[in-house]
Regions:
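Conserved beta-sheet core of the metallophosphoesterase superfamily
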Residues: 123-126, 239-297
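N-terminal catalytic scaffold of extracellular/periplasmic and nuclease hydrolases
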Residues: 35-130, 136-138
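Binuclear metal-dependent hydrolase catalytic cores centered on His/Asp/Glu-rich metal-binding motifs
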Residues: 62-76, 109-110, 173-225, 322-326
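Active-site environment of divalent metal-dependent phosphoester hydrolases
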Residues: 58-60, 96-99, 132-146, 163-168, ...
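A short C-terminal boundary segment appended to hydrolase-like catalytic domains
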Residues: 32-35, 42-46, 56-59, 63, ...
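Bacterial Sec-dependent signal peptides at the C-terminal "C-region" and cleavage site
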Residues: 18-44
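Short acidic, glycine-rich surface-loop motifs adjacent to enzyme active sites
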Residues: 85-98, 131, 213-238
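Active-site-proximal segments of metal-dependent phosphoesterases and phosphodiesterases across multiple
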Residues: 99-120, 223-256
Length: 326
């Protein structure tokens, strides 16, 4: 006669059958990674990163926000692009703080911290601070800006409590491979003393940037290295000979892509040794109205385990709002 299964065995079978169902309701086993980065967009083993130009939250943009709100700065096409990407890196062209610290420079900007959550809501994940306006409210304003960015759920890049921290490469992803961002301001700061032991933005020389790239490449031959450089001449369309030389030196030692801003214009784009160099991608959310300042682009990187597809997406800025070209 066949023996009846024991009660203990029956209980074990029931538990095995019910466990996946219970987990799906309880959330146990969820790694708490942002859903944006763990959904089907990674199913094809592709990491999508979008990089924008200058994002200003003062002057004419402040007036626009006062009239229509921060959410209105994001057109439907931009919203769709950002939310279909894993990461979005924008160059924040102002401190965002309640601190007002006297500085001596021509253009002084400041945004409101309460506006930052809207940037995160619309898909921005990282804000680059290695530029000539992050110090517009002094060192205390710079430190507070970093904290406000973190509170809003984003990650600041290119600034720190000292130069060593400000210049440290940022690992933004390990899937499908390690992706590093190295950011630097390649211009002198107006009436702002270089004090490397004090809060500051990254102002690494090309030789120092080369050392960062060489170190990253030596540690991981297959990593992806993106450089964000705030450099060049404002309101010019061509890169300088020095920029071209510097960019090629960085590619020669292992950089995979270089994206620049500061010019407020769309500048030279070239490919060197199969690697893209965007010397200046122009503005993003900005109040300059001249045609030369209203044409820009965003850059989309689609990174897999062994290659990267780079896409140039032209935009037009109308009344501070960027629109993707149709």
């Amino acid at each position: 006669m066949m023996k009846r299964p024991s009660i203990a065995l029956v209980v074990k079978v029931i538990i095995c059958l019910l466990t996946p169902i219970l987990l799906s309701f309880s959330g146990i086993g969820d790694n708490n990674i942002d859903k944006k980065k763990s959904t089907s967009k990674e199913a094809d083993d592709t990491l999508r990163i979008v990089i924008t130009g200058d994002l200003l939250l003062d002057r004419g943009v402040r007036q626009k926000i006062d009239m229509v709100g921060v959410d209105a700065l994001f057109s439907s096409g931009i919203d769709s692009l950002f939310h279909s990407s894993n990461y979005v890196i924008a160059n924040l062209e102002c401190p965002v703080t309640k601190i007002r610290e006297r500085v001596f420079k021509r253009f002084i900007f400041r945004g409101e911290p309460e506006w930052l959550p809207s940037l995160r809501h619309h898909g921005i994940t990282h804000l680059n601070l290695a530029n000539n306006h992050s110090i517009d409210q002094g060192r205390r304003g710079l430190l507070d800006t970093q904290e406000q960015i973190k509170k809003a759920g984003m990650i600041p890049i290119g600034a720190g409590r000292n130069m060593e921290e400000a210049a440290e490469p940022i690992l933004i992803s390990t899937i499908p491979r390690h992706v590093w961002v190295v950011s630097s301001l390649r211009l002198p700061l107006e009436n702002f003393p270089y004090l490397p032991q004090k809060p500051c933005v990254s102002q690494e020389s090309i030789d120092s940037l080369i050392m960062h790239v060489e170190r990253l490449r030596a540690a991981d031959k297959n990593c992806y290295i993106l450089l964000l450089l705030h450099w060049g001449w404002e309101h010019h369309f061509k890169a300088t000979p020095q920029q071209r030389e510097d960019a090629r030196r960085l590619i020669d030692v292992g950089a995979d892509a270089i994206v620049g801003h500061h010019s407020h214009t769309l500048q030279t784009i070239e490919t060197y040794r199969g690697k893209p160099i965007y010397y200046g991608i122009g503005n993003f959310i900005f109040d300059q109205r001249k045609p030369m300042n209203s044409r820009a682009c965003v850059v989309e990187l689609s990174i897999t385990t062994n290659k990267c597809k780079v896409k140039y997406l032209p935009i037009e800025i109308k009344n501070c709002i960027p629109y993707l070209d149709k």
